[in-house]
Structure formats: structure tokens, C-alpha cells
Amino acid sequence: MVGEGDQHMAVGKAVVLARGLGTRMRKADASVVLNEEQEKVAQKGIKALIPVAGGRPFLDYVLSALADAEIDKVCLVVAPEHEELRSRYSREVRLERLSISYAIQERPLGTANAVAAAEEFVGTDPFLMVNSDNYYPCEALTALRELTGAGVALFEQNVMLAESNIAAERILSFAVGLINGEGCLERILEKPAQDVLATLPRPLWLSMNCWRFSPMIFEACRRIGPSPRGEYEITDAVQLAIDQLHERFQAVCIAKPVYDMTSRADIPSIAARLAGIQVRL
């Protein structure tokens, strides 16, 4: 069943999760040389505002890719104290292709809790959901936008290993999407054991938290309980939507990499990969 009201609606909205605490970004790393501005922002842990190619914040590139995919309304889910994020996009930057709203996630209670904070922004519309610390290829965002219903972008593991900036040991532990015979998501396997991975068909398709949702996801977010680590996880909400609400998530399989901004070691590699990309907000 396709989410109500989402069968033929064009997607113009995206929710960007920007509430992260940045614990690993704050951690000093003597092997990484940062400039003064990068060091200043890294100490605060605001990954999205780390200056990269051309001195522009990483989030500028994430938002520009959404605009390239014809998204024109974005909601940043932020912490109450993230005034710098709100100030940049409300006052410091001229927005030509995007309008940007904000939703406050009062406490860091997980990705489903963050998505729920944006319910007023979403209303009855379908929407994309992405992380603020990942740069997704425009092809993935466009493919999700063009679906007729809910969906997930999954990324080929071998391509991620060869072309992403993410360390191989991290990629090998990433969640894997299981796809049924109809081309829809059946389940997300979080941190699957090697013996389990060995039984799965190749190639492996990784979930990088890049979704198209219908408003039905908010009901799923309300129904789930906390995970073992005490957070409300969007993957749990998706599984509930599949199992109990009969939502179908079409799988969009992408053979391009995702870049990840987690620690200071990621800054130089991302800056090199984003050099030459034009940002237009």
C-alpha cells in the first residue's frame, strides 16, 4: 500500500537531521592538520558547519544537492542551542533556490524522534529525509523524488569501499538493506555479523539514512519504543510501517558513493572530493 496522498504527489520538501552532538568531531586528532576556522568549528562539534572546499560549510553542499534534485523546501532539525546554524541560513546566506525552516529536537533521543519534530513542517506532503553529515549523490535524491510512494536509497558496498571517504572497517559494519522480489525493502539489518553477511546475495546494498517518506511515518514514530541504547530509531519506525501499517518502501539502488563527515580525519578527504562542485542555495 502506498502512503495515503503520496501516489502521484511531486516531492518538494526535505527534512535534514542536524541535531547530532558531534562527539567524535570534538575529539582532537594530531594526525589531521586543520586551518583556524576548521579547528574552531570542530571544537564545537557542529559537523554541518565545518568549512570544506572553498571555505563553504559542508551543509551548503548537502543543501545544494537537494536543490539540484528539485527540492525547494527544507527543514533543518536542530538542537535548541544551534543558533549558529539558524543564523547562517536565516540571515547570512542569500537563498535563491531553497526556503529553509527549522524544527527543534529538544533532546537527542534518536533519529525517529528527530523526524517526528518536523511533522508540522511536513503536513500531509511526502518528503525526503537525509543526514546533515552525509553528502549524497544527486542521482539518489532525484530517484527518490521521482518515486510514486515511499522509498529508500541503498548504496552498493563495493562502490562505497572504492570511492567513498569512509574507512573500510566502518563500511563493512554498515546496515544492509534486504530487498524482496518486488524490489521493495524487506528489512534493514543493523551491524550484521560476518556469518550473516556471508549468506546474503551480492552485491550488498547499504542503508545511509536516505529516505522518501509519506506522512504515515509519523504514526510509526509514535508507535515504536526505545532501542536497547535508549533512542527512538528511524529504522525501527520503518520496520513497523512495513509490518503493521503495510507501507511499501521501494528500493532505489545506487552505484555511487556517499561521503561522510564524522571526525576530523574526514575533513581533508571531503574537501578534496567536493572541490570544483558549484554550490547554489
Regions found by a protein language model. Give the residues of each.
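A structural signal for short hydrophobic beta-strand segments in well-ordered beta-sheet cores
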Residues: L49, G177-I179, A251
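Short, surface-exposed amphipathic charged segments that create phosphate/polyanion-binding patches used
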Residues: A114-F121, N165-S173, A265-S269
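Phosphate- and divalent-cation-binding pockets in alpha/beta enzyme and binding domains
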Residues: E84-L85, E139, A237, S269
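The conserved acidic donor/metal-binding loop of glycosyltransferases
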Residues: S132-Y135
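Conserved core of the sugar-phosphate nucleotidyltransferase
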Residues: P137-P215, E219, I224
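Short, conserved catalytic or adaptor-binding loops enriched in Gly and charged residues
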Residues: R91-R97, L178-I179, A241-D243
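Conserved N-terminal catalytic core of the sugar/cofactor nucleotidyltransferase
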Residues: V2-K44, A48-M129
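Conserved alpha/beta core of the MobA/IspD/sugar-nucleotide pyrophosphorylase nucleotidyltransferase superfamily
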Residues: D6-A10, A14, I188-L281
